[in-house]
C-alpha cells in the first residue's frame, strides 16, 4: 500500500526514489494528479468522476511507465 502525506492544502503527496532522482506524485481534490521530478512536471491528468483513489492509480501507473522506459 502506498503512503501519502496530506498537506495542509489537502493535497496528498507521495515521494518515490527513481534512478534519476526523487519523483513526487501529487493528488488533489477533484481527481486531479501530477507527477514531478526536480520541480519539473513529468505529467498530469484528471479522472472524470473525481475519484482520488483512481487518480492515485493513474499517477502511479504513469510514473511506473516512466521508470520502466528509463532502463
Predicted regions, residues:
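Short intrinsically disordered terminal tails
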Residues: 1-3, 64-71
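Serine/threonine-rich, low-complexity intrinsically disordered segments
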Residues: 17-20, 38, 54, 68-71
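Short, compact, well-ordered microdomains
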Residues: 60-61
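A short, exposed loop/beta-hairpin motif centered on an aromatic-Gly-Thr core
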Residues: 38-54
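Short N-terminal "domain-start" leader segments
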Residues: 1-34
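Intrinsic-disorder/low-complexity regions
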Residues: 16, 29, 48-50, 64
